[in-house]
Amino acid sequence: MGIFMIKRLKKRDVKVPLTVPEDRKEEYIKNYLELTKRTGNVMLFAGDQKIEHLNDDFFGEGIAKDDASPEHLFNIASKGKICGFATQLGLIARYGMDYKKIPYIVKINSKTHLVKTRDPISRALVHVKDVVDLKENSGLKILGVGYTIYPGSEYEHIMFEEASRVILEAHKHGLIAIIWSYPRGKNVKDEKDPHLIAGAAGVAACLGADFVKVNYPKCDNPAERFKEAVLAAGRTGVLCAGGKSIEPEKFLKQIWEQINISGARGNATGRNIHQKPLDAAIRMCNAIYAITIEGKSLEEALKIYYGDRK
């Protein structure tokens, strides 16, 4: 699988949303170019699961012992090649003083999986103003915010309104806004259906998101079918969720196809990175980054991950 050429963006190439005030346009452009490494693509390290999945993803069979401590996430983010590390504000406040060079995306809302409801709802834990205050008071490299919506839930209207306000407030301060968009609820028959995923991507575009994180479809020929979501999102860049840990070769091949066949603008990976020991987690970051940001081939990415180990 050959190399996909990635264009280097200049300031003038960034389409600044009209919701960004004139005096914040430079800040928005700076954050956008930093987050995308001047490519328009994003390799996001997702570390918000300590609320979402409690300790299930961090302790147990097949999970590295390193992962039992939250600091494992920060060690990976500080040593691996990433565009941004997404996690909750509270965790950043507890560890950020020792990891000031990490580019952060603050996850605004989260919920646990303990409440067994067919129609999920996830509300804001903090306000965008709290994020801005942390950025200004700490000097941390906070580039944007993230928010999860569940289209199809009977509570979607609550999340849509809150997400819309989060995006507007983020843009007012020159921050990037990323939406996690997962169709869920008693009326959703198959959340991995490619047509439904495309709809979820389009919802994020209508809310004004800069990027949207969605699940990769489970179907025949997913790389081709996923093109519908990329088209539906328009100028909102589509990022693929990493999902459960799978074999590195299979995962990196999927990443390559998402970028080079489907036209996705990146990925947001959690378990396939942090469930590994630190050295392997760093190598996985570097391999994903090589495909997403550097335009490397699958073979080159596999060599970065395995080195002489295979």
Swiss-Prot record:
Pathway given in the UniProt record: Aromatic compound metabolism
Source domain of life: Archaea
EC numbers on record: 2.2.1.11, 4.1.2.13
Residues that bind substrate: D48, Q49, H53, D57, W180, R184, K213, V214, N215, A241, G242, G243, G270, R271
Catalyses which reaction(s): beta-D-fructose 1,6-bisphosphate = D-glyceraldehyde 3-phosphate + dihydroxyacetone phosphate; beta-D-fructose 1,6-bisphosphate + methylglyoxal = 1-deoxy-D-threo-hexo-2,5-diulose 6-phosphate + D-glyceraldehyde 3-phosphate; beta-D-fructose 1-phosphate + methylglyoxal = 1-deoxy-D-threo-hexo-2,5-diulose 6-phosphate + D-glyceraldehyde
Catalytic residue positions: Y182 (proton donor), K213 (schiff-base intermediate with dihydroxyacetone-p), K213 (schiff-base intermediate with substrate)
UniProt xrefs under InterPro entries: Aldolase_TIM, DeoC/FbaB/LacD_aldolase, DeoC/FbaB_aldolase, FbaB-like
Cross-referenced CDD domains: DhnA
An annotated Gene Ontology molecular function: transketolase or transaldolase activity
SMART domains per record: DeoC
Protein function: Catalyzes the transaldolization of either fructose-1-P or fructose-1,6-bisphosphate with methylglyoxal to produce 6-deoxy-5-ketofructose-1-phosphate (DKFP). Also catalyzes the reversible aldol condensation of dihydroxyacetone phosphate (DHAP or glycerone-phosphate) with glyceraldehyde 3-phosphate (G3P or GAP) to produce fructose 1,6-bisphosphate (FBP).
UniProt record similarity statement: Belongs to the DeoC/FbaB aldolase family.
Descriptive protein name: Fructose-bisphosphate aldolase/6-deoxy-5-ketofructose 1-phosphate synthase
Origin organism lineage: Archaea, Methanobacteriati, Methanobacteriota, Methanomada group, Methanococci
